[in-house]
Amino acid sequence: MFCPAPGIPLLATTYNLAESNNAGRADIVLPGFVASFMRKLALLVVVACLSFIVLASAQAGPGQTGQNPQIITVSQIHAGMRGVAYTVFEGVKPEAMEVEVLGVLHNVNGPKGDIILVRLHGTKVEYTGVVAGMSGSPVYLDGKLAGALAFRIGEFSKEPIAGVTPIADMLEISALDRSPAEETSAVKPSLSAVAGQTATPGETNSLPGSAQDSDGKDFANYLKPIETPLVFNGFSEQAIHLFAGQFASAGIVPVMGAGSVSDDKQPEPLEAGSAVSAVLVRGDMDIEATCSVTYVDAQRLLACGHPLLQFGSVDLPMNKAEVLATLASPLNSFKIVNTTEPVGTFVQDRHTGIMGVFDRQPEMIPVTLSIHSSTGVKQFHYEVLNNPKLTPVALMVTVFNALHGVNEFGEEITYRLAGSIGVKGFPEVTMRNMFAPAENGQPAAMQAAISLGERFGRIYDNPYNAPDIAGVKLDFDLVRERRWARLESARTDVTEARPGDNITLETVLAPYRGERIVRQIQVKIPTSASKGTLRILVSDGETLDHMGHANPAFGRKLDLASTIALLNKEHSNNRLYVSLLEADPEARVGDKVMPTLPISIMNVMDGMRGNQEMVVSGESSVDETATAPLDYVVSGVQLLTITVK
């Protein structure tokens, strides 16, 4: 039986056989049935040779297991080699695609980061092109594992040309176990997670020259990772749109509802080429990303061929996945996926791929969110990943989505929040606030989401302790009116007072489209008050908190206990506060305040300013009084002065 030599295209072989048959007719006239037989024989020869080549290339294909896979190194790969790749186009069974090596691109994926450039052949792949979700699909050359499909070329490509991450680079991930140093790095805060730097929805925290920087957004169009879109299920289009900037700054491309998550059993085992999903949020709302398995054995698997987020050590649910359909698009073909039963945990997210281990449960953060209204109670139960960079954003988008996605939602809505964040080994972080549409037009639901995200950013932003979040509980009471009031004026009944005297402040609040409210506040001048000018600050709680944030102490890193203590001391926004300010030095040590220090003590402490938890300021708050809750979100500041005799 005739078979083509290695490296000769099969289509060319078919043409030569047919041409030889036609050439024979010039000299010899064969009976019709003989000619027909010869044509069928030629076709059978081609089919047999094709099967032989595919089987030879796939001998260590999807079924390959074991601790040491047979691999082929980049130095052994050259242009013209042919092999096979596997991916799922529909269902759960990987399908073969013919692979033709075009060459090797050196140092294009970082220092010493080589990429194998290949052209894919096959009816389906030539129709769909390189597909989002195909990254990780294993490539075999000479029957050995060469690597994973991981890169595509440009936009609107007319040919399915892809880049392959060498398997040797991916196997390095297996050597990265979760050492103590690695565990510590996994929870260190990133630039976009630090307190006070949680970007407003619609903005990003990307650095100049980053992939998200508008001036350089197209720099990587020549060769870039095959997209692994993060699919949002149970989310409104507005929620995804408003928070797209935050996810973009983390390297995520949000996609609305192109699949789902369920606990349905999928009896088929994972194999090389199978679809596998990493889950960031699961429950009544789902966020997941799907790529393909490159290598699998009894304990672990490697997938993607490029990073999901490149967070290093991670702790994400690893689920099987079923491809419902592959949608062809000139811009970007993608797979529509159902994520099914969990099988383990992704523990590494590295430059050349992600690694998961079987039979390990990930540590997620459980969230219970309740919305109380006149029509009853609606509850949402879900879990979010535990990650310094993404957890605050995931909580913001899920909270906004839950509040925005109920029928009771409207522009003239106020929420009363009673909530808590459980941190193992520390006191709960309590939250009691109100949120109403403000003068700047920001919806109450967005204010609530940002408030929660900012708290989580501060919990993660400490260099001393890795927070172990036990859970989040949020109870919202929905009021169908805008309960917001501005502090219009404040005055006192005296201009002079003595230490120990009681004075009365009269404040006027102007509610949104309502009658003015007058409140009288009794204030006692401290017996320790110094003679001279005493400033009286009448304000909302947010102003006092911002004054503390502006203090240099707020920019210094505190341990987790001090951070939680400060969070629990923050002021409610439905009260008026009266603060008495003296022109005496004040020292802050962590979450503790020492007001009105004598000059001698201040001079000593001033020399300790280098201490990361010691800050001396020139003004002291000697007393603070608050009204009872007003059932309005209060906004405004008034400053009065009296003379202490």
Segments the model singles out, each with a brief description of its role:
Residues 56-645:
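Terminal presequence/propeptide segments associated with secretion/organelle targeting
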Residues 11-12, 23-24, 30-34:
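Intrinsically disordered, low-complexity segments enriched in serine/proline and basic residues
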Residues 44-54:
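Bacterial N-terminal signal peptides
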